[in-house]
Curated annotation (Swiss-Prot):
Modified residues (N-acetylserine): 2
Positions bearing N6-acetyllysine: 88
GO terms (BP aspect): 3'-UTR-mediated mRNA destabilization; cellular response to cytokine stimulus; miRNA metabolic process; mRNA catabolic process; mRNA processing; mRNA transport; negative regulation of low-density lipoprotein particle clearance; negative regulation of nitric oxide biosynthetic process
Regions of compositional bias (Basic and acidic residues) in chain numbering: 111-123
GO cellular component, as recorded: cytoplasm; cytoplasmic stress granule; dendrite; neuronal cell body; nucleus
Record-listed cross-link Glycyl lysine isopeptide (Lys-Gly) (interchain with G-Cter in SUMO1), residues: 122
Classification via Gene3D superfamilies: K Homology domain, type 1
Compositional bias segments (type: Pro residues): 8-17, 398-408, 502-521, 529-543, 588-614
Phosphothreonine found at: 101
Protein name: Far upstream element-binding protein 2
UniProt-annotated stretches for the region 4 X 12 AA imperfect repeats: 572-685
SUPFAM superfamilies: Eukaryotic type KH-domain (KH-domain type I)
Length: 721
């Protein structure tokens, strides 16, 4: 046995058969220990008998006796077993304790209370404190827990829970906080969420909830907390929908409420409880920015008011009302005309009518697209009338008058509107270099599809070979209205970075070649009525009265196609032009004529006059017939009487003809064709049709020098395609 004392006499000889204390019973100490306690002291058999037990002796036991040593060994074993149990619970390896090393807590300490004369109760209390101090770090005090009520939007609960509870489980695992969502919001816009855990865990769970709600609303993460829990950035407003009118707000298949949400930029929830009576008013919850919520409320009330006035859901000649607007069907090939270049036309309609117009997205298979007009009912109807008038003008437009001399068949002036179209609609054929066809078609045909969608025309590559059989060119066909073809032509020219070359007269080509009138840019190249503003100059161009009816003038439908005339036109160009005149001039033309003919160009100074080319047809009679038919149109009622400029223009062109032939004022016109009568008749009829008041100076024929310059520009103008 080891000696735990630091001083005193050495221990006596061991007893012959028993415990280490000799006659333990004589000491007057406590009763002997349990039977197994003698293992350390080497006591003999028996418990409590003579020499056995190893029980600690009484106070009279001398220091260094066997009793205190046995007591200390039992305590050390208990501490060691407690440490091993704690190590197993904590998952750490058990620590082996060496009782004989000074590192153990009791190896080098004095037995102050043991050696003193303190009572036993104080000794046991001190031993208990020592055990508690060693077992304390094994079981740390539990952390503080808290429970907080948090509120989230009722509509975001499903997003927070996730599919199969995946999202809420992730929140609990990542934050270490228990999340419990209330089963019902009680009709309120927010639902209560109970968060239980340590303060830092609760805070982390709140941040994760904020991120989920912010992403669900389409905003950046972390911006919901202030909105949903007392902030001012979001507004929730409820309005009561009268019984039986909830279907008006929802619409067929939810179409109306979807349109309201898209137009106002808010979220709408119509709270419907299956247990409620159908005759009970139902709340409509609107969530969004304050001004958007207010706008949405007004839109909903407008729908309800229209229903009360008997106007909701009624159809008229312009389309069907949906959500306070009007739907107008527009032929797919005419969408580009309604929109206009760079959206100019649709912007003008919106500004004039005070509405908003949007084309609904569709699959592109139907023959029409729907233009949805939004605004007050009277303004919507006004915009619908404008669109329908525009579409009607596209269905009937004026036939184009003859084009410029030498104008290639099937072509049209680019950008300025000098050329005009003949028969309505139709198609045009152009040749494009083979190596640039891919730019027009695009990968998978995406470029040509985009051109068709933007312009409303139909562009395709022709299987026919070019007229000269050149393999380096391909033919493209564009079908549609003149405006659509022109728009598609410009887009193709931008793709190939060059002009298109028209090929052959096709259906809907231009009018026949004829004398070209003076150049005056303007819509549809109406002739210049009215008196000339400057002395010696030609009459200026006067625009027709502003109005939607004049934007796209009406034209008469053509007569049935004659195959005999078509065959003759294919073989003989003159026969083709003659067929054109006989076909189109037998019917009354539209109210707005095309460009007027121009006088022949005078020869340059010092050069002899050139005789007219041989084989060139004389279109003088055709022009006279053309303007006579135009003159048959009655004058507009209420228009003031117009001054007749016939004589002034006749005199002007006579002088031009004399100068062109090299003669003086009294010289005969010679072989040069005289268009004086045609011009005079044209301007007289134009002045009568448009109702323009004459200028203050009256008709003043232009000077000879300016007239020469005008005629030279007219005949020397090159038509760029």
């Amino acid at each position: 046995m080891s000696d735990y004392s630091t001083g005193g006499p050495p221990p006596g000889p061991p007893p012959p058969a028993g415990g280490g204390g000799g006659a333990a019973g004589a000491g007057g100490g406590p009763p002997p220990g349990p039977p197994g306690a003698g293992d350390r002291g080497g006591g003999g058999p028996g418990g409590g008998g003579p020499g056995g037990g190893g029980a600690s002796g009484g106070p009279s036991q001398p220091p260094g006796g066997g009793g205190p040593g046995i007591r200390k060994d039992a305590f050390a074993d208990a501490v060691q077993r407690a440490r091993q149990i704690a190590a197993k619970i904590g998952g750490d390896a058990a620590t082996t304790v060496n009782n004989n090393t000074p590192d153990f807590g009791f190896g080098g300490q004095k037995r102050q209370l043991e050696d003193g004369d303190q009572p036993d109760s104080k000794k046991l209390a001190s031993q208990g404190d020592s055990i508690g101090s060693q077992l304390g770090p094994i079981h740390p005090p539990p952390r503080t827990s808290m429970t907080e009520e948090y509120r989230v939007p009722d509509g975001m609960v499903g997003l927070i829970i996730g599919r199969g509870g995946e999202q809420i489980n992730k929140i609990q695992q990542d934050s270490g906080c228990k999340v419990q969502i209330s089963p019902d919001s009680g009709g309120l816009p927010e639902r209560s969420v109970s968060l239980t855990g340590a303060p830092e865990s609760v805070q982390k769970a709140k941040m994760m909830l904020d991120d989920i709600v912010s992403r669900g609303r389409g905003g950046p993460p972390g911006q919901f907390h202030d909105n949903a829990n007392g902030g001012q950035n979001g507004t929730v407003q409820e309005i009561m929908i009268p019984a039986g009118k909830a279907g008006l707000v929802i619409g067929k298949g939810g179409e109306t409420i979807k349109q309201l949400q898209e137009r106002a930029g808010v979220k709408m929830i119509l709270i419907q409880d299956g247990s409620q009576n159908t005759n009970v008013d139902k709340p409509l919850r609107i969530i969004g920015d304050p001004y958007k919520v207010q706008q949405a409320c007004e839109m909903v009330m407008d729908i309800l008011r229209e229903r009360d006035q008997g106007g909701f859901g009624d159809r008229n000649e312009y389309g069907s009302r949906v959500g306070g607007g009007i739907d107008v069907p527009v032929p797919r090939h005419s969408v580009g005309v309604v929109i206009g270049r760079s959206g100019e036309m649709i912007k003008k309609i919106q500004n004039d009518a005070g509405v908003r117009i949007q084309f609904k997205q569709d699959d592109g298979t139907g023959p029409e697209k729907i233009a949805h007009i939004m605004g007050p009912p009277d303004r919507c109807e006004h915009a619908a009338r404008i669109i329908n008038d525009l579409l009607q003008s596209l269905r009937s437009g004026p036939p184009g008058p003859p084009g410029a001399p030498g104008m290639p068949p099937g072509g049209r002036g680019r950008g300025r509107g000098q050329g005009n179209w003949g028969p309505p609609g139709g198609e045009m054929t152009f040749s494009i270099p083979t190596h640039k066809c891919g730019l027009v078609i695009g990968r998978g045909g995406e470029n040509v599809k985009a051109i068709n969608q933007q312009t409303g025309a139909f562009v395709e590559i022709s299987r026919q070979l070019p007229p000269n059989g050149d393999p380096n060119f391909k033919l493209f066909v564009i079908r549609g209205s003149p405006q659509q073809i022109d728009h598609a032509k410009q887009l193709i020219e931008e793709k190939i970075e060059g002009p298109l070359c028209p090929v052959g007269p096709g259906p809907g080509g231009p009018g026949p070649a004829g004398p070209m009138g003076p150049f005056h840019p303007g819509p549809f190249n109406q002739g210049p009525p009215g008196a000339p503003p400057h002395a010696g100059g030609p009459p200026p161009h006067q625009y027709p009265p502003q109005g939607w009816g004049n934007t796209y003038p009406e034209w008469q439908p053509p007569a049935p196609h004659d195959p005999n005339k078509a065959a003759a036109a294919a073989t003989d160009p003159n026969a083709a032009w003659a067929a054109y005149y006989s076909h189109y001039y037998q019917q009354p033309p539209g109210p707005v004529p095309g460009p007027a003919p121009a006088p022949a160009a005078p020869p340059a100074q010092g050069e002899p006059p050139q005789p007219p080319p041989t084989g060139q047809s004389d279109y003088t009679k055709a022009w006279e017939e053309y303007y006579k038919k135009i003159g048959q149109q009655p004058q507009q009622p209420g228009a003031p009487p117009q001054q007749d400029y016939t004589k002034a223009w006749e005199e002007y062109y006579k002088k031009q003809a004399q100068v062109a032939t090299g003669g003086g004022p009294g010289a005969p016109p010679g072989s040069q064709p005289d268009y004086s009568a045609a011009w005079a008749e044209y301007y007289r009829q134009q002045a009568a049709y448009y109702g323009q008041t004459p200028g203050p100076g009256g008709p003043q024929p232009p000077s000879t020098q300016q007239g020469q310059q005008q005629a030279t520009e007219a005949n020397g103008y090159e038509l760029h395609l």
